[in-house]
Amino acid sequence: MTFLSRWLRLQPGEGSRAGWMVLYSLAAVGGVIITGSLVGRALFLSALPAEAIPYKYLLPPLVLIVVSALYARLAARWSRPRLIYIVCVLSAVGILSTRWLLSVESHSFTLLCGLYVFIDVISALVILQFWTFAGDLFTAREARRVFPLITAGSTLSNLVFGLGLSAVASSVDPGDLLLIMVGSLVVIAGVTVRLAPETISASTDNESRQSRPPSRIDLRTHPLLPTIAGLVLLVTIISNIADYQLDLALQRHYGDDGRGMLAFLGSFRFWSGLGACALQFLVARRLLERFGVGAGLLLLPVAIAGGSMAILLTGGALWAVSVPRGSDVVLKYTIHDASLNLLFLPIPDSLRASAKAWIDGILRPPVAAALALMFLWVGPETTPQAWAIPVLVLVMVWMWL
């Protein structure tokens, strides 16, 4: 056992798998999710009016309902690696096609909405596949040691990609940065090729593909799923409100300056990533091992509540509006996701992937769409501080659960 493995308290055989999954996490979260969301947001907000903002919350969940329903069926029949390869190839083709279209018409509402929807769907599938694949690689006992470690890729990606995007924002067209997503998808496929033979369920793939897909009754009656679903839905509502608050503040501050907006968002990701690094490497692992999943899930609502109070006290200053979203960045892809996915481990492997697809693709999108309709109804004239009040109420409900 190497010094690094002893320092990280990894058992023999865990180090190689954990290292490859850190790379997978870096590519998925940094190269696909962060790059896609920042570039898509800058293109959207700098080219379209404030009245269009609610559509970037309304359209993605509606499309995700259809995509997730299809994915849930395929997940019960095809192996996880095969699904990862298909998603990577189709996503890369779509991104390259969209980049060409942006060179023709960069202010099209249809194209920019389509791009945002496409990026959102890709991001949802990529992170879903990351965690289900990680669940196939590690037992429940191994996961308690390894899951906080493999999320280090998510933490580092905020630093690396946030700083990188901020540095090049003033000299590179935002649309060209979409090519980073293509390269990251290639990395994801490569890591999957390397680790596919080591999955715990590799020997039972043929049986799982031929077995009956879990029914809705199976999904609804498992004792853990209602609690997990409730947490996911609350996180969705609060995160989307925080994101909408930031959209309103960004557009009022930067207007049509897409490069300035991207530079700010890159810096925002960098500083959030710095906080996430401190949490990930100094706190997360020991917190989960000593106090368990409950403590890990409690940090995010407390941080968002503090950010909402800052919005109210400062009258909606840009830095204050960034705090709830920053809390989401610091905690969601680190200790919160690790804690939430530990809750999935007692669920049988035959049910786990379909359960995640059911929660993320069937339950969550209608809730997000309903919230977007509320954004449309209220209108962009509503200030970020007005939205801070319902966030505080929802956080109290979250902590009660």
Language-model region placement:
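Helix-loop junctions at membrane interfaces in 12-TM secondary transporters
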Residues: W100-Y116, L195-T199, A310-R325
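Juxtamembrane intracellular "pre-TM" segments in multi-pass secondary transporters
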Residues: M1-E14, S203-A229
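Cytoplasmic membrane-interface "Motif A"-like loop-to-helix N-cap segments
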Residues: A76-L90, S171-L177, L282-V302
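Symmetry-related core transmembrane helices of the 12-TM Major Facilitator Superfamily/SLC fold
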Residues: I86-I95, G175-R194, L298-L300, W319, ...
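C-terminal transmembrane helical hairpin of 12-TM major facilitator-type secondary transporters
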Residues: A295-I335
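Substrate-agnostic recognition of the 12-TM MFS/MFS-like secondary transporter fold
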Residues: A18-Y71, L111-A169, R209-D218, V232-A284, ...
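Membrane-helix interface/capping residues of multi-pass secondary transporters
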Residues: A50, R80-P81, A140, D173-G175, ...
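C-terminal ends and interior cores of transmembrane alpha-helices
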Residues: V89-S108, A284, L300-G316
